[in-house]
Amino acid sequence: MSSTSDKVKGMANEAVGNVKQAVGKATDNTKLQAEGKAQELKGEGQQAKGEVKDAVKKGVDKV
């Protein structure tokens, strides 16, 4: 998977996670809030993975 793909999927997961958290909070559904937080963290991880891939590629390109 490319770094851009990781970043895009990460942003999407983070956004969906935020929505789930908001809906869970509004409906007093703690399970949905927890699912949203987990999905948000997954998205943050995917974005970080994309950033690392970019950094590695830039490092390799310098060699």
Curated annotation (Swiss-Prot):
Residue ranges, annotated region (Disordered): 20-63
Record-linked SUPFAM superfamilies: Hypothetical protein YjbJ (SSF69047)
Entries under Pfam families matching the protein: CsbD (PF05532)
Transmembrane segments: none
Biased amino acid composition, Basic and acidic residues: 50-63
Family under the similarity heading: Belongs to the UPF0337 (CsbD) family.
Official protein name in the record: UPF0337 protein PSPTO_1596
